[in-house]
């Protein structure tokens, strides 16, 4: 890949869920481009405590504290990436899901972004510039029956992102969404290992079964966190200055429809 080692020089970025997986891929790419990056995570690895803020973004108080700390440390935020998210496996199907199950999915996958945007956007409006990316999921287009609240929340996040882009474009702020498919993060790899142990098959065979379970991946392999990081870096850079309100699917071709 072409390197753009100084394209984000002088810019600051905040990334939620940025210590592992896709979030780390995004953070690493923005740092490589010269950005000053803070990441938010539930816990702070000792070795990275200088650029990590411990935050529970599933609560209003947690998001408020994160926004205040990030602005205090960075002064202003030019790039905001909402990567945090999560899905749980429901037992008993949709009818067994409680209001608490739904609220938890909405708090983590939708309201975390809404609340943090509310804290950070005013500064962007004052400066007349900024770039936001909301990380959604192909489940918003191809939902699985085992994670219905998650899929619904990500669909809502996509629509929120589009509406927000329409509001903020005249103010010089761009908003886009990135929709990843199966990306082999640390947790995804562990899942493949566990499947392999349970079924007495290799990790490669387990990975193939996972890909088949989502309808296959035409490119033949899972994505990498760095792949998503490269896409996000493009979208928040000046190279994408005329792009806003878009959703970019990065799934190796998993979603067959347009």
Give the role of each language-model region.
Residues 2-5, 91, 142, 221, ...:
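Short C-terminal tail/terminal secondary-structure segment
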Residues 12, 19-20:
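Conserved glycine-rich cofactor-binding loop
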Residues 91-94, 98-106, 132, 213:
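Substrate-binding pocket helix/loop in short-chain dehydrogenase/reductase
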Residues 117, 153, 161:
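Active-site helix of classical SDR
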Residues 142-148, 170-171, 220, 238:
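Active-site loop immediately N-terminal to the catalytic Tyr-X3-Lys motif
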Residues 169, 174, 243-245:
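Short, small/polar-rich loop/turn modules that mediate ligand/substrate recognition or access, typified
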Residues 177, 201-239, 243, 252:
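C-terminal helical subdomain
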């Amino acid at each position: 890949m072409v390197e753009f080692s100084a394209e984000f020089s002088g810019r600051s970025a905040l990334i939620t869920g940025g210590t592992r997986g896709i979030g780390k891929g995004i953070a690493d790419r923005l740092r490589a481009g010269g950005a000053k990056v803070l990441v938010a995570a539930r816990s702070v690895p000792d070795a990275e405590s200088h650029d990590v803020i411990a935050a529970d973004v599933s609560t209003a108080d947690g998001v408020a504290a994160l926004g205040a700390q990030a602005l205090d440390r960075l002064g202003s935020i030019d790039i905001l990436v909402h990567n945090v998210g999560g899905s749980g496996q429901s037992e008993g199907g949709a009818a067994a899901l409680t209001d608490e199950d739904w609220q938890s999915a909405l708090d983590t996958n939708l309201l975390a972004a809404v609340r943090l945007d509310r804290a950070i956007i005013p500064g962007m409006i004052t400066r007349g510039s900024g770039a936001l990316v909301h990380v959604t999921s192909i489940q918003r287009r191809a939902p699985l029956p085992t994670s219905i609240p998650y899929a619904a929340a990500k669909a809502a996040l996509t629509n929120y992102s589009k509406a927000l882009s329409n509001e903020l474009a005249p103010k010089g702020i761009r908003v886009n969404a990135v929709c990843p498919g199966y990306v082999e993060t640390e947790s995804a790899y562990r899942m493949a290992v566990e499947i392999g142990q349970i079924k007495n098959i290799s990790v490669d065979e387990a990975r193939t079964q996972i890909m088949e379970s989502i309808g296959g991946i035409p490119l033949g392999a899972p994505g990498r966190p760095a792949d998503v990081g490269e896409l996000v870096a493009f979208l928040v850079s000046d190279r994408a200055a005329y792009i806003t309100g878009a959703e970019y699917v990065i799934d190796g071709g998993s979603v067959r429809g347009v």
